C-alpha cells in the first residue's frame, strides 16, 4: 500500500493508464502530431480525425450532437465562456443572472465580474442540506432574467441538484440554463436530450483525463448564442479560438469513453467504499456529515469532527491525502464558504474534512484511513480543553470568553 493514501479525487484524478497510452500516440514525429486545422496534408487530416473521434466520445457521454461540443482549456474556461458569453450576447434582453452561494469560484467570480459591468446577480442560499429548492429558484426569476447557473454536483459536499426539474422550469420561463458539471460528468448519467439544459461545463481531469482540457456543451436546438471571450483563428465554430491540443483532446475523449462504459461498475464499487468509510468513523462522538447523504454523489464524503481543528487534523492525518474545502481555495485559512452557506458556525466549518474516493481506491486503503482517523481524533481531543469542558457538560455557547 502506497502512502500517503490518495482520498482527494474531487480535486483531481490520476490519468487512467489507458488514456495516457492514447495520448502518447499524438505527440511525437511517428504519431498524430499535426495541427487539426492544417487542411493541406495528411498530418493535419489525421489530427482532425483524432479530434473528431474524441468530440464524438465526449458527445456520447452526455448524449449530445458532436457539433454541440466546444473544446476549452478546462471547466473554469467553460464556465467563463458560458456565463460571460450569454451575458454579453443577450444583454439587450435583460441583465439579471441567478446562481447559488455554493457554486465553484469559477462561476462566482465570473458573476462578480459581470456585476462590475452592470449586470445584477442573485445569489441563492441553500437549505441546511446543501440543496436549493425549486421554489427558491422560481421566486428569484424576473422579467429581465437571462441566465440561471446551478452546479450539478457540489465539489465540497457532493450534493446532487435535480437538474432536470430546474431545466424544465427555466425552459418554461424562456431563461437560459447553465450547469457546471465538472464534478458529475463521467460519474453520473447526463442526458441532454431529456434534460432541458442549454450549457454544460465539463472537465477532463475530474474523470481520469489530463489537466488543461475541458469542454462546453452548447445546445443547437433551441439554439444558444454566445459571444466569444477568446479571439483568433475562429476555431470551434468561432466560439473558442486557439490551436486544438490534439493529445489533450484525444485524452479527454478516451476518458469519456471509459467513464461511459465503466460508470455503473465504478459507482457500485465506490459506493461500497464510501459506506465502509462512513461506517468506520460515524461512531466517533460529535461527528456530523455535511450535505444530504442520500442525495449526494457516492464518491464524496464531507465530515465535521467537532472540537478538533481542521488544520491540526489534516497534519495528524499525514498518511491521508485529503482536503478541508476545495483545492481552489484551500490556500486560504478562511472556513469553507460552502459550509458557511449551509449554516455551519466557524468551528464546525473549520473541523471539516472532505474525503473523495475514486477508481483506484482500495478496501485496504479505506481500512487504513478508518484506523488513522479514529486514532488521530482521539489523540487531538485528549489535548483539547474544549473537549474536556464539553465532556463535563459545560454549554460552550454560553461561556463568556475573556478578551486579552
Swiss-Prot record:
EC numbers for this chain: 2.8.1.7
First-listed, main subcellular location of the protein, grouped into a coarse class: cytoplasm
Binding site for pyridoxal 5'-phosphate: 75-76, 155, 183, 203-205, 243
Family to which the UniProt record says this protein belongs: Belongs to the class-V pyridoxal-phosphate-dependent aminotransferase family. NifS/IscS subfamily.
Annotated GO CC locations: L-cysteine desulfurase complex
First-tier enzyme category under EC: transferase
Pathway(s) annotated for this protein in UniProt: Cofactor biosynthesis; iron-sulfur cluster biosynthesis
Source superkingdom: Bacteria
Active site: 328
Cofactor(s) required for function per UniProt: pyridoxal 5'-phosphate
Swiss-Prot/TrEMBL keywords: 2Fe-2S, Cytoplasm, Iron, Iron-sulfur, Metal-binding, Pyridoxal phosphate, Transferase
Subcellular location(s) per record: Cytoplasm
One GO term (biological process): [2Fe-2S] cluster assembly
SUPFAM superfamilies: PLP-dependent transferases (SSF53383)
Protein name according to UniProt: Cysteine desulfurase IscS
Catalytic activity: (sulfur carrier)-H + L-cysteine = (sulfur carrier)-SH + L-alanine
Gene, per the UniProt record: iscS
Residue numbers bearing the N6-(pyridoxal phosphate)lysine modification: 206
Keyword DNA-binding: no
Function: Master enzyme that delivers sulfur to a number of partners involved in Fe-S cluster assembly, tRNA modification or cofactor biosynthesis. Catalyzes the removal of elemental sulfur atoms from cysteine to produce alanine. Functions as a sulfur delivery protein for Fe-S cluster synthesis onto IscU, an Fe-S scaffold assembly protein, as well as other S acceptor proteins.
Binding site for [2Fe-2S] cluster: 328
InterPro entries: Aminotrans_V_dom, Aminotrans_V_PyrdxlP_BS, Cys_deSase_IscS, Cysteine_dSase, PyrdxlP-dep_Trfase, PyrdxlP-dep_Trfase_major, PyrdxlP-dep_Trfase_small
Quaternary structure and partners: Homodimer. Forms a heterotetramer with IscU, interacts with other sulfur acceptors.
GO molecular function per UniProt: 2 iron, 2 sulfur cluster binding; cysteine desulfurase activity; metal ion binding; pyridoxal phosphate binding
Amino acid at each position: 500500500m502506497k502512502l500517503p493514501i490518495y482520498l482527494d479525487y474531487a480535486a483531481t484524478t490520476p490519468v487512467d493508464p489507458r488514456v495516457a497510452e492514447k495520448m502518447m500516440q499524438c505527440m511525437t514525429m511517428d504519431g498524430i502530431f499535426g495541427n487539426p486545422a492544417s487542411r493541406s496534408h495528411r498530418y493535419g487530416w489525421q489530427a482532425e480525425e483524432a479530434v473528431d473521434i474524441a468530440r464524438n466520445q465526449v458527445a456520447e457521454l452526455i448524449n449530445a450532437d458532436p457539433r454541440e461540443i466546444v473544446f476549452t482549456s478546462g471547466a473554469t474556461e467553460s464556465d467563463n465562456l458560458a456565463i460571460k458569453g450569454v451575458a454579453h450576447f443577450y444583454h439587450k434582453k435583460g441583465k439579471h443572472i441567478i446562481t447559488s452561494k455554493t457554486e465553484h469560484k469559477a462561476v462566482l467570480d465570473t458573476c462578480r465580474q459581470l456585476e462590475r459591468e452592470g449586470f445584477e446577480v442573485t445569489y441563492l442560499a441553500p437549505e441546511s442540506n446543501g440543496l436549493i429548492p425549486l421554489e427558491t429558484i422560481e421566486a428569484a426569476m424576473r422579467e429581465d432574467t437571462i441566465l440561471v447557473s446551478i452546479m450539478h454536483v457540489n465539489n465540497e459536499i457532493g450534493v446532487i441538484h435535480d437538474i432536470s426539474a430546474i431545466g424544465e422550469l427555466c425552459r418554461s420561463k424562456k431563461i437560459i440554463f447553465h450547469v457546471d458539471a465538472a464534478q458529475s460528468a463521467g460519474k453520473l448519467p447526463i442526458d441532454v436530450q431529456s434534460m432541458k439544459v442549454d450549457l454544460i461545463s465539463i472537465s477532463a481531469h475530474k474523470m481520469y483525463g489530463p489537466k488543461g482540457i475541458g469542454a462546453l456543451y452548447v445546445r443547437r436546438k433551441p439554439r444558444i448564442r454566445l459571444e466569444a471571450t477568446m479571439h483568433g483563428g475562429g476555431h470551434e465554430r468561432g466560439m473558442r479560438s486557439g490551436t486544438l491540443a490534439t493529445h489533450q483532446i484525444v485524452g479527454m475523449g478516451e476518458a469519456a469513453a471509459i467513464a461511459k462504459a465503466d460508470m455503473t461498475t465504478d459507482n457500485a464499487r465506490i459506493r461500497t467504499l464510501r459506506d465502509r468509510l462512513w461506517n468506520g468513523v460515524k461512531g466517533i462522538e460529535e461527528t456530523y456529515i455535511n450535505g444530504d447523504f442520500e442525495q449526494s454523489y457516492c464518491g464524496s464524503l464531507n465530515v465535521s469532527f467537532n472540537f478538533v481543528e481542521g488544520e491540526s487534523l489534516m497534519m495528524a492525518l499525514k498518511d491521508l491525502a485529503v482536503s478541508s474545502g476545495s483545492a481552489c481555495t484551500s490556500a486560504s485559512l478562511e472556513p469553507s464558504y460552502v459550509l458557511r452557506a449551509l449554516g455551519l458556525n466557524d468551528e464546525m466549518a473549520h473541523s471539516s474534512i472532505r474525503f473523495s474516493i475514486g477508481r483506484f481506491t482500495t478496501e485496504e486503503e479505506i481500512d487504513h484511513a478508518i484506523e488513522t482517523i479514529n486514532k488521530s481524533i482521539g489523540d487531538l481531543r485528549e489535548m483539547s480543553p474544549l473537549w474536556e469542558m464539553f465532556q463535563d457538560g459545560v454549554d460552550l455557547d454560553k461561556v463568556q470568553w475573556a478578551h486579552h
